[in-house]
From Swiss-Prot:
<dbReference type="InterPro" id="IPR036179">
    <property type="entry name" value="Ig-like_dom_sf"/>
</dbReference>
<feature type="domain" description="Ig-like">
    <location>
        <begin position="1"/>
        <end position="112"/>
    </location>
</feature>
<dbReference type="InterPro" id="IPR013106">
    <property type="entry name" value="Ig_V-set"/>
</dbReference>
<dbReference type="InterPro" id="IPR007110">
    <property type="entry name" value="Ig-like_dom"/>
</dbReference>
<dbReference type="GO" id="GO:0019814">
    <property type="term" value="C:immunoglobulin complex"/>
</dbReference>
<dbReference type="GO" id="GO:0016064">
    <property type="term" value="P:immunoglobulin mediated immune response"/>
</dbReference>
<keyword id="KW-1280">Immunoglobulin</keyword>
<dbReference type="Pfam" id="PF07686">
    <property type="entry name" value="V-set"/>
</dbReference>
<keyword id="KW-0391">Immunity</keyword>
<dbReference type="InterPro" id="IPR050199">
    <property type="entry name" value="IgHV"/>
</dbReference>
<dbReference type="GO" id="GO:0005576">
    <property type="term" value="C:extracellular region"/>
</dbReference>
<dbReference type="InterPro" id="IPR003599">
    <property type="entry name" value="Ig_sub"/>
</dbReference>
<protein>
    <recommendedName>
        <fullName>Ig heavy chain V region GOM</fullName>
    </recommendedName>
</protein>
<dbReference type="GO" id="GO:0003823">
    <property type="term" value="F:antigen binding"/>
</dbReference>
<dbReference type="InterPro" id="IPR013783">
    <property type="entry name" value="Ig-like_fold"/>
</dbReference>
<keyword id="KW-1064">Adaptive immunity</keyword>
Length: 114
């Protein structure tokens, strides 16, 4: 059974930082290009960041570029998202998923509010 478990979400003030984690089990993690996506209240899914395993390349949505950093540790079957300079508009449930969206976790809630 494939499981993706996200954690690290919290209530944080604007300008603060959080580090999200996603731990995978049941898949060969090193074979997957992974991404973080988010769903803000009342809105659709938005791709936030991706990590291309073969190239060790990263890409970011314009809204988070320069503030968020994605990283992947295949030895720990883990994906991370370092989030700095958080804004109210970053409030959302954050999910990790393979590039083709084969699997989903339960998500972790990030709330940015003063």
């Amino acid at each position: 059974e494939v499981q993706l478990v996200e954690s690290g979400g919290d209530l944080v003030k604007p300008g603060g930082s959080l580090r999200l984690s996603c731990v995978a089990s049941g898949i060969t993690f090193s074979g997957y290009d992974m991404q973080w996506v988010r769903q803000a209240p009342g809105k659709g899914l938005q791709k936030v960041a991706y990590f291309n395993d073969a190239l060790s390349a990263q890409g970011y949505a314009d809204a988070v570029k320069g503030r968020f950093t994605i990283s992947k540790d295949n030895a720990k079957d883990s994906l991370y998202l370092q989030m700095n300079s958080l804004r109210a508009e970053d409030t959302a449930v954050y999910y990790c998923a393979p590039w083709q969206f084969e699997y989903w976790g339960q998500g972790t809630l990030v709330t940015v509010s003063s």
